[in-house]
């Protein structure tokens, strides 16, 4: 624990400032806040910080908490459902998968409920025009004499409760304050037809100043848009024109400062003159930057940008980092070939997955073996995608099997997707993961508006045949609690406005170029072309507005690239080798290499690659997945434990290593620690990950 080093000399009757600014000594409202701070007290019985009063059993229940009035849910009801949905989206709560025995609210905390106080506000970084949500949770178990704080930026594009079951649970159970931010993402759904949007408490509002997000269309522009494209939504992450990812690190740093303000509001020393001494500050408070996926990437960027010494250590899982491209080093797994074409951007590899994966789903060895492939991916659509790709010269071969095999080869060989990811990629395609990321991030990076309808894509509810319909009022009323922030989600789908016939849900749309239901491949190829800067079918450079948008997207991607400079902060990454959403050859692995190139022997980053683990633990509750894969969540909590021991007891972090887990083989066999060997303090030589000779070497 850091020793207390106050910048004040406290006498009998006076406080004398030494070398500190006044706002560093006395508690003051951060100037980046753009709203009042809302405070809520939870007793740990009827309601609480972690489970919203549901307890461990309620979170595990397949029946979500209901609203008394489906059209007018209360803020408390929306919060409860948001916590329920966000917890279950990140943590496998199915029986036998480790919930309740290895992790979960009641593990190490009998009731599972955590009393305390919650503070919510809106904030902005300099230059931004759209607010970001920030929240601090302070459990009753927080000890002001030994203060600690954990960051919990939301994973994915989720809202303010998006990290409640990951960094939130670990930090609250540790007695730490937990600071959250939605990173400028979250639901933020502006119904352009009704002009309603979500307020900070989740209820619908028509007041611009109360909304989480509204498209910057004046009344006439909105009417004109609605007359041509009725019942559409603008979404905060996609359409705010802010490229929020460029500021994710700053959002996390601001959330920490907000946390210090709230902690001193509660525990600072009142001096009797209207001032409160900041007795809890970065010098005496242990701060771990954490979270998973996009939230993990945000905390990594925060550590890189930390100029005030706010962060002591970093512990993240499967972080979405876009490392700066550095070809001075390569990556090699086992005796395989050295990979130099690493560090592709999220939009680059995601648009490739969006284009080719639908065909690769039909490859021999994949189509009948990949879990849930037949359930989520109609074979006829996959075959049409293959046929369209072949007709455009994008795959080769004599048969549909050949085309599908070539699509898989392209992803593995040309785009560096690990073979371990191949069996999980089909279910992700069926869940529209790559498609939704490609659409949202192309808009966000290019700072496009809803009115631009990039690649002819928009967002709306659709009926059974795929045609656009108004979103049901009850569904809209619950969007704050039900949506993951990146459609298709909670009844709002991706719509291909240029589909043959009429605007149609992308998944069942026919491309004009093929007249086949090929998942709107023309739209996906358009997104791919924007990522490359050339028409991927003709090979010709983009022209006009498309070329300008590509340049804007390229600038947006450059703004989110990570530097690799962690400022020597102790850092832990845990990542599953089978991650089929954020391929490890473009995220965690090259970040480790970049960090070595930047920090060298001064690096304190450790990388633990977990075999038989992937990105979405929630899928482990399904047959074919839970029997093959283990929860990465378990190792994320172990990473946090290791970081805690490093910062409090000076325990050394274990060397970088591959962790060889043992899948349980059947969902009827409960997961135990025998399946989950710990990260070793002294791993075998055959398991060590090393950087030598400008190469990151990873054992098979």
From Swiss-Prot:
Q: Where is the signal peptide?
A: 1-21
Q: Where in the cell is it found?
A: Secreted
Q: In which pathway does it act?
A: Lipid metabolism; butanoate metabolism
Return one GO MF term: hydroxybutyrate-dimer hydrolase activity
Q: What is this enzyme's catalytic activity, as reactions?
A: (3R)-hydroxybutanoate dimer + H2O = 2 (R)-3-hydroxybutanoate + H(+)
Task: Look up the EC number in the record and give it.
Answer: 3.1.1.22
Q: Which InterPro entries match?
A: OHBut_olig_hydro_put (IPR016582)
Q: Which family does it belong to?
A: Belongs to the D-(-)-3-hydroxybutyrate oligomer hydrolase family.
Q: What is the protein name for this chain?
A: D-(-)-3-hydroxybutyrate oligomer hydrolase
- From which source organism is this entry? Marinobacter nauticus (strain ATCC 700491 / DSM 11845 / VT8) (Marinobacter aquaeolei)
């Amino acid at each position: 624990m850091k020793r207390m080093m106050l910048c004040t000399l406290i006498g009998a009757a006076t406080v004398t400032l030494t070398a500190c600014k006044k706002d560093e000594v006395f508690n003051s409202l951060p100037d980046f806040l753009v709203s009042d701070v809302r405070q809520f007290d939870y007793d740990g019985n009827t309601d609480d910080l972690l489970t919203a009063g549901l307890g461990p059993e309620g979170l595990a229940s397949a029946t979500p908490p209901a609203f008394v009035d489906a059209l007018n849910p209360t803020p408390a009801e929306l919060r409860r459902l948001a916590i329920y949905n966000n917890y279950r989206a990140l943590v496998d709560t199915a029986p036998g998968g480790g919930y309740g025995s290895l992790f979960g609210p009641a593990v190490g905390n009998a009731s599972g409920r955590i009393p305390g106080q919650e503070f919510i506000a809106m904030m902005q970084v300099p230059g931004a025009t759209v607010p970001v949500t920030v929240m601090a949770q302070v459990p009753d178990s927080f000890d002001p004499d030994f203060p600690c704080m954990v960051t919990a930026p939301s994973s994915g594009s989720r809202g303010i409760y998006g990290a409640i079951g990951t960094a939130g649970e670990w930090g609250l159970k540790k007695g730490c304050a937990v600071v959250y931010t939605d990173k400028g993402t979250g639901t933020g759904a502006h119904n352009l037809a009704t002009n309603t949007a979500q307020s900070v408490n989740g209820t619908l509002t028509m007041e611009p100043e109360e909304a989480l997000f509204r498209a910057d269309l004046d009344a006439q522009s909105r009417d004109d848009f609605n007359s041509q494209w009725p019942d559409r939504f603008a979404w905060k992450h996609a359409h705010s024109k802010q490229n929020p990812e460029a500021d994710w690190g700053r959002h996390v740093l601001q959330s920490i400062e907000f946390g210090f303000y709230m902690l001193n509001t509660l525990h600072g020393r009142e001096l009797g003159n209207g001032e409160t001494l900041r007795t809890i500050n970065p010098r005496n408070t242990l701060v771990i930057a954490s979270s998973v996926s996009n939230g993990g990437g945000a905390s990594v960027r925060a550590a890189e940008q930390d100029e005030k010494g706010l962060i002591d250590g970093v512990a993240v899982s499967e972080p979405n980092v876009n490392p700066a491209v550095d070809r001075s080093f390569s990556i090699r797994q086992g005796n395989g070939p050295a990979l130099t074409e690493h560090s592709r951007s999220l939009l680059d590899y995601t648009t490739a997955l969006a284009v080719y994966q639908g065909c690769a789903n039909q490859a021999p060895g994949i189509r009948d073996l990949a879990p849930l492939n037949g359930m989520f991916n109609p074979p006829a659509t996959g075959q049409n995608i293959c046929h369209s790709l072949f007709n455009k010269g994008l795959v080769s071969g004599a048969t549909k099997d050949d085309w599908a095999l070539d699509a898989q080869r392209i992803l593995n060989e040309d785009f560096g997707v690990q073979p371990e990811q191949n069996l999980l990629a089909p279910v992700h395609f069926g869940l529209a993961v790559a498609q939704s990321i490609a659409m949202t991030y192309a808009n966000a990076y290019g700072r496009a508006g809803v009115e631009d309808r990039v690649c002819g894509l928009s967002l709306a509810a659709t009926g059974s045949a795929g045609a656009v319909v108004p979103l049901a009022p009850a569904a809209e009323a619950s969007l704050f609690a039900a949506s993951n922030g990146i459609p298709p989600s909670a009844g709002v789908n991706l719509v291909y406005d240029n589909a043959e016939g009429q605007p149609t849900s992308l998944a069942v749309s026919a491309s004009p170029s093929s007249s086949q239901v090929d998942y709107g491949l023309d739209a996906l190829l358009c997104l791919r072309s924007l990522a490359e800067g050339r028409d991927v079918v003709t090979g010709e450079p983009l022209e006009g507005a498309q070329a300008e948008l590509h340049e804007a997207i390229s600038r947006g991607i450059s703004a989110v690239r990570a530097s690799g400079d962690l400022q020597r902060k102790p850092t832990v990454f845990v990542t599953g080798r089978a991650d089929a959403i954020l391929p490890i050859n473009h995220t965690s692995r090259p970040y480790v290499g970049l960090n070595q190139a930047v920090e060298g022997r001064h690096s304190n980053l450790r990388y633990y690659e977990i075999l038989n683990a992937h990105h979405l633990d929630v899928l482990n509750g399904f047959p074919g997945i839970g029997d093959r894969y283990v929860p990465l969540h378990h190792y994320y909590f172990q990473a946090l434990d290791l970081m805690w021991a490093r910062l409090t007891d000076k325990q050394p972090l274990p060397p970088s290593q591959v962790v060889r887990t043992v899948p349980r083989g059947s969902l009827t066999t409960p997961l135990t620690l025998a399946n989950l060997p710990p990260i070793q303090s002294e791993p075998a030589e055959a398991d060590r990950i090393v950087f030598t000779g400008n190469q990151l070497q990873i054992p098979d």
